[in-house]
UniProtKB/Swiss-Prot annotation:
Protein name (database record): Putative 4-hydroxy-4-methyl-2-oxoglutarate aldolase
Database matches in NCBIfam families: NOT-MenG, PRK09372.1
Binding site for substrate: 80-83, 102
Regions crossing the membrane: none
InterPro entries: RraA, RraA/RraA-like, RraA/RraA-like_sf
Record's cofactor remark: Divalent metal cation.
UniProt xrefs under Pfam families: RraA-like (PF03737)
Family recorded in the similarity comment: Belongs to the class II aldolase/RraA-like family.
EC numbers: 4.1.3.17, 4.1.1.112
Needed co-factor(s): a divalent metal cation
The species this protein was found in: Cupriavidus necator (strain ATCC 17699 / DSM 428 / KCTC 22496 / NCIMB 10442 / H16 / Stanier 337)
Amino acid sequence: MKPVTTDLCDAHEDRLADGTLRVMAPVFRAFGKQGAFAGPAATLKVFEDNSLVRTALEAPGQGRVLVIDGGGSLRCALVGGNLGLLAEKNGWVGIVVNGCIRDTAELDVCDIGIRALAVHPQKSQKRNVGESDVAVQMPGAVVRPGNWIYVDADGVLVSDERLGN
């Protein structure tokens, strides 16, 4: 699916008003080959530790979007080229990171979509600390497991259920 976030917002003003459709803050940079992507969310809450990111991406993605609340840290990367390839191989359609990524040249040839706050060359810690399948606070919106994520050049939307145009 190639979402058009502007059309979704226009068609679902009632959901925007009642909070069942939310718009993330416009703070993300785009990476990966897919400029637009959509799917149900899988969620992680981590801080400067990407162990659970690898674990999540090793599982079949089944067309899902991995939403990572990295606490907005700008001190290290949570996703790099190896994890981008793993996501592509295992059927994830996208990754949204409240934090940093690295290996942008490698990520930009992965056939997935990625949104992140920034780029940082340093890798993260590996302590197996964090939570999966929990509600996460992303910039401007809470995301719960199973919410639908819609991403294109105009923004990132979070819906409590799958939307049609």
